[in-house]
């Protein structure tokens, strides 16, 4: 199965742009972990961080291109832990947070505390407030949750973290490459980026809605002091300090991401965002017409729904038999469809036809 088949419906990744693939292949023999040998790739990485910083309201942001959201979230938690210096460090994450935070807690020796969600599946701010203690080194908010595409109330989290002097990390691995462009088209979506003074770091993945090849993730910090807090000496390399988790990093991701961002421009990404939201609305409307039950109204390009009489796992099995690759969310249990750029409206019409057939057979 391929992305271009239009039948992969549960993935947050997509077909990379042909230009990005060509550039990636041209830079296979490069190593950002030893940038003195490959100076051009370091400049391209800096260019990407600069463009993302502009997009996310902090032109002077510092950061790196890395493998993806898991590594970015790990780096953010490491920076927060190192800067806080707590003896028994804790992090507070929403129950909707990505599983990578459990990995980070395990690797870094952090106690992970989960905040409750409200009725709309966004983090409950009062639950976060109650969990804060003298050991809290970071609070996490999500801009585009993995299962439902919800945007946490980051503005309120920012105020809390400013008052408490706590690192606020925003996991925008999914939302970071669509929310800003939808806002530019007039969509009423909440602020989540460095414009909010309490935000310390942001994860964003160009290999999701950015059309960059896998692996192309990014971590951005408000300033370079967060990188300094993770820096170690690398005496035998051309660069004598390193703050990333991974030592050997391909320069191909930096080059390909730089190329596709320059090629698309903000206007190109705005058009892409509007297109996927149009496909999202078509699926949403078709499901309602067929009497499927929406979990929530889509905020981004993710639709979660249930059959009125059939469990989501059984429905997923039926769809798989018909050639569709969907995923099942856990909070709450539902069929989850991510409307990535490889999914066109004609694919959704075929899906709705199959969903109608399933409904008719159950009546």
Swiss-Prot record:
Secretion signal, residue range per the UniProt entry: none
N6-(pyridoxal phosphate)lysine found at: 208
UniProtKB keywords: Decarboxylase, Lyase, Pyridoxal phosphate
GO molecular function list: aspartate 1-decarboxylase activity; pyridoxal phosphate binding; tyrosine decarboxylase activity
Domain of life: Archaea
Catalytic activity: L-tyrosine + H(+) = tyramine + CO2; L-aspartate + H(+) = beta-alanine + CO2
Pathway assigned in UniProt: Cofactor biosynthesis; methanofuran biosynthesis; Cofactor biosynthesis; coenzyme A biosynthesis
Listed SUPFAM superfamilies: PLP-dependent transferases
Cofactor field: pyridoxal 5'-phosphate
Biological processes, Gene Ontology terms: carboxylic acid metabolic process; coenzyme A biosynthetic process; methanofuran biosynthetic process
EC number per UniProt: 4.1.1.11, 4.1.1.25
Parts of the chain that traverse the membrane: none
Record function comment: Catalyzes the decarboxylation of L-tyrosine to produce tyramine for methanofuran biosynthesis. Can also catalyze the decarboxylation of L-aspartate to produce beta-alanine for coenzyme A (CoA) biosynthesis.
HAMAP family: MfnA_decarbox
PANTHER family listed in its UniProt record: PTHR42735, SPHINGOSINE-1-PHOSPHATE LYASE 1 (PTHR42735:SF6)
Family that this chain belongs to: Belongs to the group II decarboxylase family. MfnA subfamily.
Protein name per the record: Probable L-tyrosine/L-aspartate decarboxylase
Protein species of origin: Methanothermobacter thermautotrophicus (strain ATCC 29096 / DSM 1053 / JCM 10044 / NBRC 100330 / Delta H) (Methanobacterium thermoautotrophicum)
Organism classification: Archaea, Methanobacteriati, Methanobacteriota, Methanomada group, Methanobacteria
Gene: mfnA
